[in-house]
Amino acid sequence: MGAGRYWTEYEPVIEPRSVTVVGYEALARFRKPDGSPVPASSMFALLHADPALLARVELELKRHQIENRPADTELFVNLDPDSWFHSKPADAGELLGLLKRGGRTVVEVIENMDAADALVGRDLVTTLKARGLSVALDDLGATNGLFSFEALEQADVFKFERSFLRRLGDRRKAIVQAFVRMAHETGARTVMEGVETEADLDLAVALEMDLVQGHLFRDRSVVVGR
């Protein structure tokens, strides 16, 4: 990718009771040659059509995100199992080395949309854990997400996807609460994403979430490379 075509936004990860920043999630941002923004979802959809390119871009992004991370805080970075699966051995080794040298880093394994990809995701979780890295399962509750008991057993962090905030009936709330209890009983942490209002923050506290993220705290973001 050409210089100046991407940057990193470090979105704050907040302890919801004290409303203090305890870490950041590194989010890739992209622009066209004319400077106009490109949604990250659109960019990654295009990259998935060329898995080898996806793997190379992922390595470059992770290098930028880790080398420019805010000091003395925990860093959450996303890793797509497809990019891992299609990485050359040398690139995969470099990526693991970057993550290991990155200090307090949690690797978020992005949920996938079919069973074959879910198996790749499970294997990625196992590889990361074997290297002593902390692992988060991203987007729990997503409509088209999949997860395995093996991945759940190994995860250090469970992240709940934002759309459940807008469709949290009694039954779904009970399921989320059961996940939170399970996480705490096994020593894992929970994160609620998509917190946009004070009411969302109050809900996170009521659900006993450990951490939150979202637009409500956008003014605390750190931007590098724009």
Task: Describe each region flagged by the PLM.
Residues M1-E11, L54-E58:
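Short, basic/aromatic recognition patches
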Residues M1-R5, P16-T20, F30-P33, E111-A115, ...:
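EAL-family c-di-GMP phosphodiesterase catalytic domain
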Residues W7-F44:
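A short, well-structured catalytic beta-strand-centered motif of the EAL phosphodiesterase domain
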Residues L54-V120:
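Catalytic core of bacterial c-di-GMP phosphodiesterases, primarily the EAL and HD-GYP domains
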Residues D91-L98, V120-L128, A151, I175-M182, ...:
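A general structural detector for well-ordered alpha-helical segments in enzyme core domains, enriched
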Residues R104, L124-D138, A183-M192:
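Short beta-strand/loop segments at the ligand-binding rim of alpha/beta enzyme cores
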Residues T127-F164:
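Histidine/lysine/aspartate-rich catalytic loop segments that bind and position anionic ligands
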